[in-house]
């Protein structure tokens, strides 16, 4: 079968991401996959396309490698910043390994020093750390609070490689459990603490226990709300990025099964780095690799017949900078037509 025939074969769904642009209710888009498959390039390109049809778009990197700055040739940090050349597309890079001390400080507690008299900061920290994954989840919660206040119409997450991605998606549940546990303990011990504190009603350092607990409850409610949104296919989807090789396909299948177990919608796969050597090509390596890629492309078609599978070519140069990203992004909505083999 020629590549052109493969491209135009009758599929149940079109081989583009146009459906994501048409889905006006979409609020959260996660882009993930194994390392080195073009995940950041894909997320940047999708963000560019979404910016054409949405009022305001935010692209967030949760990958510690932080490739957004390299992709756009512009420095990004933990505050949202407009991308050069765009009026409605912003980006930010966050560290998913945030610290619990930072969150306690943001919630009105300054750690053991300011709460030292009663050791309350240490108690909360120890309690929080007793729940696996809560340190990263705290950082995630802070991001959600910030993003929610910024009121972007759609948010795209350029996630860390596969394992980290799936853990990231569990954070809402993890943090909801942690905060519920702390709220329960505050109900049990709150009266005792207030009795110890006497009429001041405050903690050492001028903090107020009720204010801290109120902020924690507010954070828990935010997490619960976003957790529900993540499980709503009208609001959230996950775009899987892979290459046509065994390990990448294996990781993609594992990821899709886990996403399904979390009740998170996924119906788009982007297959990057495909070779399309011409029929007169003298590159034997290219032909051999194309033969292997065809085998895995066929498997992808069989496994994911109800997915939008986008086939992206291997390019001769890096996709960096606004102009090259825009050209690449165009192929996400207008299928690449390879030369006849």
UniProtKB/Swiss-Prot annotation:
GO terms for cellular component: GET complex. Its EC number is 3.6.-.-. It is an enzyme of class 3 (hydrolase). Zn(2+) binds at residues 283, 286. GO terms for biological process: tail-anchored membrane protein insertion into ER membrane. Keywords: ATP-binding, Cytoplasm, Endoplasmic reticulum, Hydrolase, Metal-binding, Nucleotide-binding, Transport, Zinc. It comes from the Eukaryota. One of its GO terms (molecular function) is ATP hydrolysis activity. Pfam families: ArsA_ATPase. The keyword Cytoplasm applies. Its main location: cytoplasm. It is found in: Cytoplasm; Endoplasmic reticulum. The keyword Zinc applies. ATP binds at residues 34-41, 245, 272. The active site is at 63. ATPase required for the post-translational delivery of tail-anchored (TA) proteins to the endoplasmic reticulum. Recognizes and selectively binds the transmembrane domain of TA proteins in the cytosol. This complex then targets to the endoplasmic reticulum by membrane-bound receptors, where the tail-anchored protein is released for insertion. This process is regulated by ATP binding and hydrolysis. ATP binding drives the homodimer towards the closed dimer state, facilitating recognition of newly synthesized TA membrane proteins. ATP hydrolysis is required for insertion. HAMAP family: Asna1_Get3 (MF_03112). Belongs to the arsA ATPase family. Homodimer. This is ATPase GET3. The gene is GET3.
């Amino acid at each position: 079968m020629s590549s052109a025939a493969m491209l135009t074969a009758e599929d149940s769904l079109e081989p583009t991401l146009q459906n994501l642009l048409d889905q006006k209710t979409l609020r959260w888009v996660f882009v993930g996959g194994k390392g080195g498959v073009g995940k950041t390039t894909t997320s940047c390109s999708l963000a560019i396309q979404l910016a054409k049809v949405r009022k305001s778009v935010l692209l967030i990197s949760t990958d510690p490698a932080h490739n957004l700055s390299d992709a756009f040739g512009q420095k990004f940090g933990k505050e949202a910043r407009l991308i050069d050349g765009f009026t409605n597309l912003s980006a930010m890079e966050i560290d998913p390994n945030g610290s619990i001390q930072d969150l306690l400080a943001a919630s009105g507690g300054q750690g053991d020093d300011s709460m030292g008299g009663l050791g309350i900061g240490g108690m909360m920290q120890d309690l929080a750390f007793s729940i696996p994954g809560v340190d990263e989840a705290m950082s995630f919660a802070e991001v959600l609070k910030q993003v929610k206040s910024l009121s972007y119409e759609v948010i795209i997450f350029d996630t860390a490689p596969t394992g980290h991605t799936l853990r990231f998606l569990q954070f809402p549940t993890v943090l909801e459990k942690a905060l519920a546990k702390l709220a329960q303990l505050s109900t049990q011990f709150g009266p005792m603490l207030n009795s110890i504190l006497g009429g001041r009603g405050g903690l050492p350092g001028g903090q107020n226990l009720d204010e801290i607990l109120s902020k924690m409850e507010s954070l828990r409610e935010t997490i619960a709300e976003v957790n529900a949104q993540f499980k709503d296919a009208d609001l959230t989807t996950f775009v899987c990025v892979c290459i046509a090789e065994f390990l990448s396909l294996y990781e993609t299948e594992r990821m899709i099964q886990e996403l399904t177990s979390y009740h998170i919608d996924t119906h788009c796969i982007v297959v990057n780095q495909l070779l399309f050597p011409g029929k007169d090509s003298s590159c034997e390596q290219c032909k051999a690799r194309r033969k292997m890629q065809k085998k895995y492309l066929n498997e992808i078609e069989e496994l994911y017949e109800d997915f939008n599978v986008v086939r992206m070519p291997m390019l001769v140069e890096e996709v960096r900078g606004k102009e090259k990203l825009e050209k690449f992004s165009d192929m996400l909505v207008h299928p690449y037509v390879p030369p006849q083999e």
